[in-house]
């Protein structure tokens, strides 16, 4: 299969950043120049778009994860720092509501004791929610 065909197959499954495609296709390319040419061509035809990658990750992950976890995933995809920062800033506004919804699905009722409260807080922290959002969600549940 041609390099361009492989790239299109990856892109048909989901949005990929240029850096992700470089990593995945490097083993199949005859030369780095050939790989760069294919990726330049795909980018010129708008098959590769950082904005769509960011939007895709946010749509898939925002309901289950906090801004820190999503930031880490976006950085791992090799996206521009400005695009990552913009996406994370847009998520910060709804952080408490999203954390509350994740907490409600997992626990649904206030913690009975300090150990249970710690477990709930650690769960939300592992999901990438900020400490302020976690404190607000867990303390409001007890009220």
What are these regions (language model features)?
Residues 1-143:
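An alpha-helical, amphipathic repeat domain used for nucleic-acid recognition
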């Amino acid at each position: 299969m041609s390099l361009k065909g492989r790239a299109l197959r990856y892109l048909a499954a989901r949005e990929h950043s240029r850096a992700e495609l470089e990593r995945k296709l490097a083993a199949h390319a005859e030369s780095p120049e050939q790989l760069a040419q294919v990726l330049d061509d795909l980018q010129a035809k708008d098959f590769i778009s950082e904005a769509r990658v960011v939007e895709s990750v946010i749509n898939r992950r925002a309901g289950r994860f906090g801004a820190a976890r999503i930031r880490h995933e976006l950085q791992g995809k090799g996206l521009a720092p400005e695009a990552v920062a913009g996406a994370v800033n847009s998520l910060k506004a709804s952080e408490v509501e999203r954390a509350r919804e994740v907490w409600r699905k997992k626990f649904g009722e206030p913690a009975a004791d300090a150990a249970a409260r710690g477990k709930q807080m650690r769960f939300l922290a592992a999901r990438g929610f900020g400490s302020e959002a976690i404190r607000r969600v867990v303390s409001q549940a007890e009220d």
